[in-house]
Design a protein with these regions (language model features):
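Catalytic beta-strand/loop cores that center a nucleophilic Ser/Cys/Thr
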Residues: 54-101
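Short, well-ordered loop/turn and helix-capping segments at boundaries between secondary-structure elements
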Residues: 11-15, 34-38, 76, 80-81, ...
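Acyltransferase
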Residues: 93-175
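Hydrophobic, well-ordered secondary-structure elements that form the walls
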Residues: 29, 70, 109
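A glycine-rich phosphate-binding loop feature that marks nucleotide/adenosyl-phosphate handling sites
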Residues: 2-9, 47-49, 73, 138-142, ...
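Short, low-complexity, polar/charged sequence segments that are solvent-exposed and flexible
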Residues: 18-21, 48-52, 86-91, 124-127
Length: 175
């Protein structure tokens, strides 16, 4: 599960300030040992991470993953193992996600853009079902189409002027 899916896979969702709902506490699916508490502050940030060894993603251990977080709330992890080691230059070491032998949850949107992660997950799922895996499973899903589109948009826009209008330079990621 990613983001809200991660939260729902946990034991419980708590919303004492009624940020997301009028219900203060709701049972989760109980598939991951986490409890989510919603908060008024929203986390929005770009993330660079590495896949941690073990579990269903073990074949991708050490692979680089990039994506973003956008969520209200924090997961209190009560067991399992983390999925990703977050790379925070100059920051304290941190982890994201929770995994058990069969279930993985994370706040990291975009993690499936990593070919090694995608290949590891699909190969593991195939093995569990007795299906032969395909080495192309980790290939670029879009054949660079998004990169070509981004290049065309950048060529057609005055990014400096757009940056002045938004009061920050474009191309710079802020956490």
């Amino acid at each position: 599960g990613i983001c809200g899916g991660y939260q729902m896979l946990g034991e419980r969702l708590e919303d004492p300030d009624h940020v997301e709902s009028h219900v203060a506490t709701m049972a989760g699916l109980g598939l991951l040992p986490i409890v989510t508490t919603f908060a008024r502050d929203k986390t929005t940030r770009r993330v660079l991470a590495r896949v941690l060894p073990g579990g269903p993603l073990d074949a991708a251990a050490g692979a680089s993953v990039e994506g973003y977080e956008i969520h209200c709330g924090r997961a209190s992890v009560r067991g399992g193992a983390p999925v990703f080691a977050l790379e925070a230059p100059g920051g304290a070491p941190a982890v994201d996600g929770t995994r058990t032998a069969d279930v993985i949850g994370t706040y990291l949107h975009g993690c499936f853009s990593s070919g090694p992660l995608r290949r590891a997950l699909l190969t593991e799922a195939a093995a569990r079902r007795g299906v032969t895996s395909d080495p192309r499973w980790g290939a670029d899903l879009h054949g660079g189409r998004y990169d070509r589109l981004a290049d065309r948009v950048a060529a057609a826009l005055d990014l400096d002027a757009l940056g002045r209008l938004t009061c920050r330079p474009l191309g710079v990621v802020t956490a």
